[in-house]
Each structure stands twice: as structure tokens, then as C-alpha cells.
A protein has these predicted regions:
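Loop-to-transmembrane alpha-helix initiation sites
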Residues: 14, 62-68, 89-93, 137, ...
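Small-residue-rich segments of transmembrane alpha-helices in multi-pass membrane proteins
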Residues: 47-57, 95-107, 127, 171-182, ...
């Protein structure tokens, strides 16, 4: 039955997209959690709707407009993080609200094109194109290479920014580049995962991995493995149950998180 399903081109593209997303999404999600920036993924995913709406309204490429808007938002978030360290949640709330407001206004002005905005709101990994799959693999390769090359500096930056600065690391530049890469990754994930669920797919596998893994590297491996298993299970279940893939994947991750939380004392005891 599964072999028959794999014969479909759309399912092959969906599986490839899952593999790519499961590589970079948990890694970025882990750093976001440890940097106490979990809301950043939510903020950028909501701001991305403004990019989609601008593209639709102006008749331009929604992908490129989303990338531009999300990168700008990532830069603004980094500025606000440095300038208002104790009020970061306020700035993320403002950006999130502004992104949604701009998206709704431009969507209303675009009229019949509002359905295009809905498709980005909920996403569909089943309808992803070959070009989008290639883009996901490119960002996956970039994130993987950067992680392998700079895992120690990023580790130091994440846990002790002051020490990283004393050691001569370009703290502001590294933090800025991390935000930009995260923003690009989120923008590319939107067509597959949807604005409403992209944050869950980024954060939950990393959070589950943190409950299981004993070292930083093991947490990364666990998060990637959980992301891959959860997303593959989600697309197969969604196909046979005729449910939205993104929502199904999210519920699977939540179930994983619940089970791991219940059995966490046993895992820690071992």
C-alpha cells in the first residue's frame, strides 16, 4: 500500500520536503529555545503573511517578497533584542500584530486573490512544487554546514553571550546572521507548513529532543530523528485519514511531547 502511495509524484515531493525540513528545522528550533527566542519563529511566520500579501497585491513573486519582508523583520528583531533586552516579548507582539494587520488589509484590497493568502496561512506539504523542494534542501545544506563549522561558537553565544564577546567572537554579527538564516528558513517553510503551524514544527521536535538527549549534540540528533519520524508519520496518516497534513503533523508532535513528558523521569533515571 505504501509502495503504491510512493508512486505518486506529489508524495515523493512531500517526502523529500519532510527530509529537508527535518534537517534544519529542529536545529534552528533548538537554538531559538536556548536563546529564549521561541516566539521569534511565531513572529516571523506571521510577518511572512505580510510578504505574501504584498506579493499578491503588487503582482510580484510571493516567494521573493516573503523572503525580503522576513529578512527585514529578522533584522528589526535583532535590533530590538539588543536595545530592549527586558522587553523582547513586547517587540515580538508588535511585529506579529503589524504583520497580520498589513496582510489582512492588502488581502482585502486584492479581492479575489485572498484565497492565495489562505493557502499560505494553512500550508500544504502535499502540493509543494519541485522548486520549493530544491529551495528547502538548499537551506537545509546551509544550516547543516554552518552548524558543523560553528557549533562551538554558537554554543558559547547561546549560553553566555558576554563570554563569547570577551573571547573575541563577533557576537552581533553572529546573532544577526542567525536571525537572517532563521527568517529565510521560515519563509521557505511557509508553503509546506503554513503560517499557523510552522512554529510548532520548528520548536516541538527540539523541545522533545531536550527531554531525551543528555548532551548538546545528542539533543540535535534526537530532535532531527523525531522531526523526521513525526513528519513522515503525519503525511501518511493525513493521506489515509484525509486530514490536513500540517495539522496532523502538529498533533503527532504534541502526542510525542506528552508521552516523553510522562516518561521523562524514567528516561532521566537511565
Amino acid at each position: 500500500m505504501i509502495s503504491e502511495l510512493l508512486a505518486y509524484d506529489f508524495m515523493q515531493r512531500a517526502i523529500l520536503a519532510v527530509i529537508a525540513i527535518s534537517i534544519f528545522s529542529p536545529i534552528l528550533g533548538l537554538f531559538l529555545i536556548l536563546r529564549r527566542q521561541s516566539l521569534m519563529s511565531d513572529t516571523l511566520s506571521h510577518v511572512s503573511l505580510a510578504g505574501v500579501a504584498v506579493g499578491i497585491f503588487l503582482g510580484l513573486s510571493t516567494t521573493w517578497m516573503t523572503l525580503v519582508v522576513v529578512v527585514i523583520a529578522a533584522l528589526v528583531l535583532e535590533y530590538l533584542r539588543v536595545s530592549y533586552k527586558h522587553y523582547m516579548e513586547i517587540s515580538t507582539a508588535i511585529l506579529m500584530s503589524m504583520g497580520l494587520a498589513v496582510a489582512l488589509i492588502l488581502s482585502n484590497k486584492a479581492g479575489s486573490s485572498s484565497m492565495s493568502l489562505d493557502s499560505y496561512l494553512f500550508g500544504s506539504i502535499i502540493t509543494i512544487s519541485s522548486e520549493q523542494v530544491r529551495a528547502l534542501f538548499i537551506i537545509a545544506a546551509i544550516v547543516l554546514v554552518l552548524t558543523l563549522l560553528f557549533i562551538r561558537p554558537m554554543y558559547l553565544l547561546t549560553f553566555d553571550e558576554d563570554t563569547a564577546h570577551v573571547d573575541g567572537l563577533p557576537v552581533r554579527l553572529m546573532s544577526l546572521l542567525f536571525n537572517i538564516v532563521t527568517g529565510i528558513a521560515i519563509a521557505l517553510m511557509i508553503p509546506a507548513a503554513g503560517t499557523l503551524l510552522v512554529s510548532t514544527i520548528m520548536i516541538l521536535p527540539a523541545a522533545i529532543g531536550m527531554k531525551i538527549g543528555q548532551t548538546f549534540k545528542s539533543v540535535i540528533f534526537w530532535a532531527i530523528g523525531i522531526g523526521l519520524v513525526g513528519m513522515l508519520s503525519g503525511i501518511f496518516i493525513s493521506y489515509y485519514w484525509e486530514t490536513p497534513a500540517s495539522a496532523t503533523i502538529t498533533l503527532i508532535f504534541i502526542a510525542f511531547f506528552g508521552l516523553v513528558s510522562i516518561f521523562e523521569p524514567l528516561l532521566k533515571a537511565e
